Amino acid sequence: SLSCCYSASRQLAGGCLFSIRIFAEETPTMLQIGKTLVSLDVIESKFVCDLDKCKGECCVAGDSGAPLEESETIEIAAAYPLVKDMLQPEGIESVETYGTHTIDSDGDLVTPLIGGNRECAYTIFENGIATCALEKAYFQGKISFRKPVSCHLYPIRIQKLKNFDAVNYDRWDVCSAACKLGEQLKVPVYKFLKDALIRKYGPEWYNELSLAAEMYLKSKED
């Protein structure tokens, strides 16, 4: 059973009370912030994408498309006509065959893959680096949807539990260069993914995560 190492709570603007708890048995393993359980790997591990080294392999490797929230399937369907001319011919063929989204073997909503087992259908290549056509169109002002939040959050993965979201750091060997660069620059995962985490959970939640991280790291020094 988990025991509470220490706890703190703060009253935020609008009357929302966020509780922060650090759980531990012999050593801490997670932070509870509101309805999320955040792995301490997200606080302690370092990460900065190094596209010159990895070439965007996370858009290519893997046996399933990018996980999607139901609302995102609507956004992508609306965006597709505006990004179609940016896609690889094989990407267009995949979308025309499988749809703008599909369901994988686990029953989850995902983006379609080229050939059913290659890169995401929305992947494009620029100077040998795999990037996202949706994100490129977003920055060009063509669409208002940036990219699936699961992609934006990577290397964080969200697991839906009964009463909580589990916020975990997903270690993948294709990201080894990002781990090295993160260590060199001393940037933890949660700071590298600040924008994505705010997109997912909001600025107040992120501020509480930052506070909890500072509290936890200070407790390790004491």
Would you name each region that the model predicts?
Residues 29-222:
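Short loop/turn segments that flank or connect secondary-structure elements
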Residues 6-8, 48:
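A residue-level detector for conformationally permissive "hinge/kink" positions
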Residues 4-5, 16:
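Cysteine-centered motifs
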Residues 10-11, 15-29:
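Short, Lys/Arg-enriched N-terminal segments with co-localized hydrophobic residues
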